[in-house]
Amino acid sequence: MPFSEPGKTKFQVDLRRHLRNQGICDNLVHLICEIAEASKYVINAVRTGDLGVAGTSNLYGEEQLALDVLSDRIIKKRLIHSGVVCNIASEEMDEIFQAQADADGLYSVAYDPLDGSSLVDVNLAVGTIVSIYEGCNLLQKGRNQVAALYILYGPRVSMVYSVGRGVHEFTMNHLMEFTLSRENIVMQEEGNIYAPGGLRNKYQEGTEQFVRYLEEKGAKLRYSGGFVPDINQVIMKGKGIFMYPALNGSPNGKLRLLFELNAMAYLVENAGGAATDGKQPILDLEPHSLDQRAPVYIGCKADVVKAMEFVSRN
């Protein structure tokens, strides 16, 4: 069924209805709706929860915040409750959790429960990032995702998802229900915004030259320190590039392939953009471990191609 242009919708389209109109199976509809349901509890935790440390460390040796642990517990519980998930992997878990042994008709989910959680105590936006695959294998290319989404906890709570048929934004209303706000989001070929992560004095020469190129052409620096709000800005404005490059001393950058990069690359590509590690598309990278990291340049196609040109020279 056709939908009105943003701002002209005469009736509200809820998430479940929109998912069913995508022509996907009922189990996938159910799973995405369960994740959306979990976000209601996560946003309550963000608004009212403990901002202290949990006294534990994650797989990467990073000290976990209480909100990280609570958000992870909330989402994991909803995934198990869904009854359609076999394997679960989270940035906060040390290993893959098996929810069910039978893979028939089931999915596996990799997620970052609260990306940017260290920003909560200064009241900046944070988010949840989710990748969904068919079957029980989580160590596969991002190209094989059947769905990806993120939920942004900002002044508004929004959810952006794709099942390979366009990218769509939903906004949580006063009843804590997600209703359609933008459909079939398409990015421009080139942008004028850039969000550069990492310490610039550790940039390798190719990335440094690319940043100078952006500065010289008048691009605006817009970086919050949160991956979800920064990618949301690029997608919603339809222009620009986010980067967290290889650094001197950290050749693989910082961001995790399974828990952060694959989902965002899937969404950006479905919106007409591109994502690369500087050599090949993020979605074509073969994961070998849960903690694998990769550099990333993600956003408008022309900007990403230009970044690759600079990086490949050095």
Curated annotation (Swiss-Prot):
* Enzymatic reactions: beta-D-fructose 1,6-bisphosphate + H2O = beta-D-fructose 6-phosphate + phosphate
Q: Where along this sequence does the record place binding of substrate?
A: 115-118, 223, 254
Q: What is its EC number?
A: 3.1.3.11
Cite a single GO MF annotation: fructose 1,6-bisphosphate 1-phosphatase activity
Question: GO CC: one term?
Answer: cytosol
UniProt record, GO biological process = fructose 1,6-bisphosphate metabolic process; fructose 6-phosphate metabolic process; fructose metabolic process; gluconeogenesis; sucrose biosynthetic process
Is the keyword Metal-binding assigned to this protein?
A: yes
List where in the cell it is found: Cytoplasm
Which positions does UniProt annotate for Mg(2+) 2 binding?
Answer: 112, 115, 260
What pathway or pathways are given for this protein in its record?
Answer: Carbohydrate biosynthesis; gluconeogenesis
Keywords noted in UniProt: Carbohydrate metabolism, Cytoplasm, Hydrolase, Magnesium, Metal-binding
Any binding details for the cofactor? Binds 2 magnesium ions per subunit.
The Swiss-Prot or TrEMBL record describes its family as follows: Belongs to the FBPase class 1 family.
- Entry's HAMAP family? FBPase_class1
Write the protein's name: Fructose-1,6-bisphosphatase class 1
Species of the source:
Geobacter metallireducens (strain ATCC 53774 / DSM 7210 / GS-15)
